[in-house]
Amino acid sequence: MPEIRVTPLGAGQDVGRSCILVSISGKNVMLDCGMHMGYNDDRRFPDFSYITQSGRLTDFLDCVIISHFHLDHCGALPYFSEMVGYDGPIYMTHPTQAICPILLEDYRKIAVDKKGEANFFTSQMIKDCMKKVVAVHLHQTVQVDDELEIKAYYAGHVLGAAMFQIKVGSESVVYTGDYNMTPDRHLGAAWIDKCRPNLLITESTYATTIRDSKRCRERDFLKKVHETVERGGKVLIPVFALGRAQELCILLETFWERMNLKVPIYFSTGLTEKANHYYKLFITWTNQKIRKTFVQRNMFEFKHIKAFDRTFADNPGPMVVFATPGMLHAGQSLQIFRKWAGNEKNMVIMPGYCVQGTVGHKILSGQRKLEMEGRQMLEVKMQVEYMSFSAHADAKGIMQLVGQAEPESVLLVHGEAKKMEFLRQKIEQEFRVSCYMPANGETVTLPTSPSIPVGISLGLLKREMVQGLLPEAKKPRLLHGTLIMKDNNFRLVSSEQALKELGLAEHQLRFTCRVHLQDTRKEQETALRVYSHLKSTLKDHCVQHLPDGSVTVESILIQAAAHSEDPGTKVLLVSWTYQDEELGSFLTALLKNGLPQAPS
């Protein structure tokens, strides 16, 4: 029996280093190839030894798919392709292809040039890795080989993020990557059609969270920022270069303009220009409002937000700084945090999820004394706020996507075990489907029922709609047609269309039953008696007496003939097509009971 096997190499009951191995009908696909931001040793990369114990990875894997440019989804890609050794195709969207190498190089500089880490990929490896990338458009069906095809759907979350459908024959898996079911200030909501996959693999970062009103969150955020700068404090907002950063920049830019504020707002050097360039380049990936107003006003050209210089961190007076990366695990955001942490006037606002092991996660867990590099202790006196502007789906959004895609089974990744367990039970109760949540290295095997996809001709559907009411969503309805196979594809069409397409002439199959009737009259008179009897009995049917003496009821033909041996007996020949078998049988039984006596 065919089956689908799924093994998380990363993000199994965990957030970070997303990497899922899927085997479907003999094809092997790796979904994402991320890095764990909470580790600085080999644990940061997925354990690729699970893929194959012998032979080259390229011989085993048919392709790699990257859902978006966040490092926990693509950070291990150069390591995997250039150091572990994979030469096959890597699929991602055009924005992901453009932005991914920039973020990889930024992180490499921090890890190697500043921290001096060994066993890390080089700049050349990033370039060589990106040469293997095949960029895809949304809703484009890409044929990886003769049997394997993939298709990308809009995921929201960040610029270029996509959900992917992987299909082999009639079997399919949908992998969501990270997605957001609610539109924000610069991106639209995730969308997928009712594709009914065998398996939906969905992220579950916020498995137990239902977010409050976005407007309330925005109001609280602006209030906290405003109050801090009013009392002379500095606000640090750690963000990743693209995505949430633009969302909050648009929000603050609008507020500063409305309130006519003069307090400086800064953004990590160079990243604003890069972000601006990519949002212009991929404007079709943004939401409808930004696309509409883009010609008159580019929302990403900020008047109040300037490029940050590291010397500004020591300037007196209030300021707001957006700095990367978003989890305070390295880079400029961590440097500024160390400088400002000792002043209670200052505030750090964490707008997104932080994985375990990062400074961001530690301060959100309430730690106020941190051991930094070189065993230095840092006392945190500044105010710490968590405000979820995360571009991940919450529990309500995850349930919405499951309802939209209608999968046969669901598998949860990219979440914390306890929260995943709660969501797993909820999905099983509400949708009556099996839901799994494997740990890293654990394999889930799903048997699948082979099915044959059948297309239905538009003409047949239109005819059905004219003849009857529209089908109800949850009530099955019979559809009559002719099943034809052409070029290895099955289609249900009308019989007329089937004959035309296959070049066949129409033949009619009729059944004839003989009914013996005691009657001494002539054949014409017997036929007239039959007509009168049926006309009075069958009020809802069209009964006709034809000039040649025969009688018809709908398509059923009745003829009276003399008996060859008994002059006092007539033979009624009742003839019908297979479509009217039910009516033909009824008339035969009725006539076998005889005709009413004619008045004398």
Curated annotation (Swiss-Prot):
Keywords carried by this UniProt record: Cytoplasm, Hydrolase, Isopeptide bond, Metal-binding, Nucleus, Ubl conjugation, Zinc
Inhibition and activation profile: The RNA endonuclease activity is inhibited by BRAT1 that forms hyrogen bond and hydrophobic interactions with the active site.
GO cellular component entries: cytoplasm; INTAC complex; integrator complex; nucleus
Subcellular location: Nucleus; Cytoplasm
Active-site residues per Swiss-Prot or TrEMBL entry: E203
Cofactor(s) demanded: Zn(2+)
Functional note: RNA endonuclease component of the integrator complex, a multiprotein complex that terminates RNA polymerase II (Pol II) transcription in the promoter-proximal region of genes.
Annotated CDD domains: INTS11-like_MBL-fold
Motif residue range(s): HXHXDH motif: 68-73
PTM description: Sumoylated; sumoylation regulates its subcellular location and is required for integrator complex integrity.
GO biological process: RNA polymerase II transcription initiation surveillance; snRNA 3'-end processing; snRNA processing
The keyword Transport appears for this protein: no
Residues given in the record as Zn(2+) 1 binding sites: H68, H70, H157, D178
Cross-link Glycyl lysine isopeptide (Lys-Gly) (interchain with G-Cter in SUMO), where in sequence: K381, K462, K475
InterPro entries named among the record's database cross-references: Beta_Casp, INTS11-like_MBL-fold, IntS11_C, MBL, Metallo-B-lactamas, RibonucZ/Hydroxyglut_hydro, RMMBL
E.C. no: 3.1.27.-
Similarity-based family: Belongs to the metallo-beta-lactamase superfamily. RNA-metabolizing metallo-beta-lactamase-like family. INTS11 subfamily.
Binding site for Zn(2+) 2: D72, H73, D178, H414
Domain of life from the UniProt record: Eukaryota
Motif (Nuclear localization signal): 469-479
Protein name: Integrator complex subunit 11
Chief site of localization: nucleus
